[in-house]
């Protein structure tokens, strides 16, 4: 009898499980509470960052600890109280950033090795806590996503600073990538245009013009080489082209100046005041540089600047919501993330 013994080749190698990749969305920050104490803690951290206030000399430190932190927190606490999410006992920025991370994670649910999280540069959840949490979950690669369409040393760069500050204390560091600014990305410009059209369609009036208001910064920072202003201009130029508007129908301004130095101009509040005095009666304001609504959009623009407009003769005013966690807003972030994850997936 002949016995045939089957010959088996080597067992096929199992494909290695994909490495876990952390995706960390980062926005500016928020106090933990809307009382004076909570705002003081937040402002101390924020205003002590040399990327934000570049001259951190003895005179600034005396002013910060002697005057600013003893007067400004009470005023800003009142502003936060006007917009505070009472149900969750947190700022809208925290609520929205969490929602952005959750919806981004849901849109990437078919990629089980991706772990999406979120953090604040100042305040909580801190970048340190969330980076350490991602590493503890086995993420050997980390994509940090600064939620700023336009780059500035005072925003995007300080996110990088903090990420490296955390990583340099780790023995086993994850590989790190950081998403670039997306100030002219088609998806971003399309999302802005869509959000403006959608919001205007809900209004009982037609604005005579639209103001595009960006967070300001000291003019001196631009003179030192910060590209922020040029990127804001590029965003508005692209938005004008997409919407078929000229520079008289879509204006570019800068808000939120602080201190006595000259900041980027034209100033939003002064422009809105002049428009009203010049006879503009119906106005809308969009804030393209903010990925999520926050104190600067919900209180400074939607309340303070609306009051300025009305007080000087304006009749109808509307602040257009930021992209937030809208479908278009999440699509912008998702495209940015997927592009930067190439080679890791």
From Swiss-Prot:
A GO term for molecular function: metal ion binding
Record localization: Cytoplasm
PROSITE patterns (UniProt xref): FERROCHELATASE
First-level EC class: lyase
Known EC number: 4.98.1.1
Stored Gene3D superfamilies: 3.40.50.1400
Pathway(s) where this gene product acts: Porphyrin-containing compound metabolism; protoheme biosynthesis; protoheme from protoporphyrin-IX: step 1/1
GO biological process, one term: heme biosynthetic process
UniProt keyword annotations, A-Z: Cytoplasm, Heme biosynthesis, Iron, Lyase, Metal-binding, Porphyrin biosynthesis
Gene Ontology cellular-component annotations: cytoplasm
Positions with a binding annotation for Fe cation: 215, 296
Catalysed reaction equations from the record: heme b + 2 H(+) = protoporphyrin IX + Fe(2+)
One Pfam family recorded for the sequence: Ferrochelatase
Biological role stated in the UniProt entry: Catalyzes the ferrous insertion into protoporphyrin IX.
Record-stated family: Belongs to the ferrochelatase family.
HAMAP family xref list: Ferrochelatase
PANTHER family membership: FERROCHELATASE (PTHR11108), FERROCHELATASE, MITOCHONDRIAL (PTHR11108:SF1)
UniProt protein name: Ferrochelatase
Phylogenetic lineage: Bacteria, Pseudomonadati, Pseudomonadota, Alphaproteobacteria, Hyphomicrobiales
């Amino acid at each position: 009898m002949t016995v045939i013994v089957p010959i088996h080749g080597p067992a096929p190698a199992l494909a290695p499980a994909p490495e876990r990749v952390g995706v960390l969305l980062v926005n500016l920050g928020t106090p933990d509470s809307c009382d004076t104490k909570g705002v003081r803690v937040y402002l101390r951290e924020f205003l002590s960052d040399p990327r934000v206030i570049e001259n951190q000399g003895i005179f600034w430190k005396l002013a910060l600890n002697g005057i600013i932190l003893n007067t400004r927190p009470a005023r800003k606490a009142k502003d936060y109280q006007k917009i505070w999410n009472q149900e969750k006992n947190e700022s809208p920025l925290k609520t929205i950033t969490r929602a952005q991370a959750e919806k981004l994670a849901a849109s990437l649910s078919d990629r089980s090795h991706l772990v999406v999280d979120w953090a604040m540069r100042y305040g909580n959840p801190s970048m340190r806590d969330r980076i350490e949490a991602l590493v503890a979950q086995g993420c050997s690669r980390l994509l940090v996503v600064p939620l700023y369409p336009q780059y500035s040393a005072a925003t995007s760069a300080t996110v990088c600073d903090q990420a490296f500050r955390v990583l340099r204390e780790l023995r086993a560091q994850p590989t790190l990538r950081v998403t670039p600014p997306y100030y002219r990305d088609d998806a971003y410009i399309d999302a802005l245009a869509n959000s403006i059209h959608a919001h205007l369609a809900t209004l009982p009036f037609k604005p005579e013009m639209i103001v595009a208001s960006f967070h300001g910064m000291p003019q001196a920072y631009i003179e030192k080489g910060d590209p922020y202003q040029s990127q804001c201009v590029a965003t508005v130029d692209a938005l004008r082209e997409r919407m078929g508007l000229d520079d008289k129908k879509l204006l570019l301004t800068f808000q939120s100046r602080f201190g006595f130095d000259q900041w980027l101009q034209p100033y939003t509040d002064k422009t809105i005041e002049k428009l009203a005095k010049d006879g503009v009666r119906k106005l809308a304001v969009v804030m393209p540089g903010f990925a999520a609504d926050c104190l600067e959009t919900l209180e400074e623009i939607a309340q303070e600047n609306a009051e300025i407009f009305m007080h000087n003769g304006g009749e109808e005013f509307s602040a257009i919501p930021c992209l937030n966690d809208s479908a278009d807003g999440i699509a912008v972030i998702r495209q940015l993330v997927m592009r930067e994850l190439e080679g890791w997936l």
